[in-house]
Amino acid sequence: MAQFYSAKRRTTTRQIITVSVNDLDSFGQGVARHNGKTLFIPGLLPQENAEVTVTEDKKQYARAKVVRRLSDSPERETPRCPHFGVCGGCQQQHASVDLQQRSKSAALARLMKHEVSEVIADVPWGYRRRARLSLNYLPKTQQLQMGFRKAGSSDIVDVKQCPILVPQLEALLPKVRACLGSLQAMRHLGHVELVQATSGTLMILRHTAPLSSADREKLERFSHSEGLDLYLAPDSEILETVSGEMPWYDSNGLRLTFSPRDFIQVNAGVNQKMVASALEWLDVQPEDRVLDLFCGMGNFTLPLATQAASVVGVEGVPALVEKGQQNARLNGLQNVTFYHENLEEDVTKQPWAKNGFDKVLLDPARAGAAGVMQQIIKLEPIRIVYVSCNPATLARDSEALLKAGYTIARLAMLDMFPHTGHLESMVLFSRVK
């Protein structure tokens, strides 16, 4: 009779090596060298020595994890959040704000091959005015989880506090948890969004099954007692207003209305400073014609219109164009027009572009603006401000402007998301005469 033997499981002992960290990358990972290879080690800071084991070994680099830290950097901080290290939201609470800003600025300078002239920043804590919290019902405990995703996982970290949220939203977390955990429908809840607008606080609840009248009544009572504007979302397309009027926020002296699902910059303080800096960099004059590409609902467009002769905002999403037009009317601005266009096509042939533009601002999504760089060059503006949420696509797009005779006059790191690996930036290009 044949006999079958199970194969012996291979056991490998990972070698412990001692490294010295000399840099911090923009994602908050310590950078060290070992045997001629770059090592990325989460949790370590420059000037720290540690025993580590390699977890991933590639041809050009390797990743490692800390076994034992042997020394502490003078810029090491005690994380404020008890969930830090498990929650995927923040990566850099263990580093001083100054070190975070220096490392991000250095990464930006390397990509752009140009010195970073300034950092545009605001308060490092309590800055986030929007949060989307995942909801998950646990049948064994009959409890509702509410929180953010774990780092590198779809599992939820059940958060009790979040010090990067604006204080009004952080204070709401236990109350929202208690309310949602008391609903009959807690098995059928997807996520809850909290937004702090100038007009007040919004709560948007995504539910995957119809709510009972008792649940609706509980939610309405909760929204009234906490002074919230309540919105219910039975699917991704429908949004029911239960209480509250059109929300709005202040932007450089103007009032911008938005729909609860519209994109708004989550850091109000940096947004205000960013818009003010963009206007200063463009040096907008009363006779200028200014073009704002990827304009959204007018975050830059409307403040520009307070200083220029005329402003054209161009956006690829029709609903945002309508919102921009509405915001222009609400603020009594008659020298600004919004257009819905496919920005991958040649917009320079449109009637509104025939007189050209003196200045151009663009604020594209992460994919960048490769399709419009040649169009901007055709317009021959004197100054261009490019606001970026992805330094890699910014560096790529900048090459076209540099080849066309523009130079980088100013480069700023926008500290829009302190304690995270997100790096945003703003560049001023000037045309060489």
Swiss-Prot record:
Any one GO BP annotation for this protein: rRNA base methylation
Q: What class of enzyme is it?
A: transferase
Query: Which residues does the annotation say bind [4Fe-4S] cluster?
Result: 81, 87, 90, 162
Q: Which reaction(s) does its UniProt entry say it catalyses?
A: uridine(1939) in 23S rRNA + S-adenosyl-L-methionine = 5-methyluridine(1939) in 23S rRNA + S-adenosyl-L-homocysteine + H(+)
Which Gene Ontology terms cover its molecular function?
4 iron, 4 sulfur cluster binding; iron ion binding; RNA binding; rRNA (uridine-C5-)-methyltransferase activity
Residues the record marks as active site: 389 (nucleophile)
Tell me, what's a Pfam family for it? TRAM
Which InterPro entries is this protein grouped with?
Answer: 23S_rRNA_MeTrfase_RlmD, MeTrfase_TrmA_AS, MeTrfase_TrmA_CS, NA-bd_OB-fold, SAM-dependent_MTases_sf, TRAM_dom, U5_MeTrfase_fam
Q: Which family does it belong to?
A: Belongs to the class I-like SAM-binding methyltransferase superfamily. RNA M5U methyltransferase family. RlmD subfamily.
What NCBIfam families has UniProt attached to this entry? Answer: PRK13168.1 (NF009639), rumA (TIGR00479)
Q: Which HAMAP family match?
A: 23SrRNA_methyltr_RlmD (MF_01010)
The family database entries (PANTHER family) matched by this protein are listed as: 23S RRNA (URACIL(1939)-C(5))-METHYLTRANSFERASE RLMD, RNA M5U METHYLTRANSFERASE
- Function comment: Catalyzes the formation of 5-methyl-uridine at position 1939 (m5U1939) in 23S rRNA.
Q: Can you name this protein?
A: 23S rRNA (uracil(1939)-C(5))-methyltransferase RlmD
Task: Please name the gene that encodes this protein.
Answer: rlmD
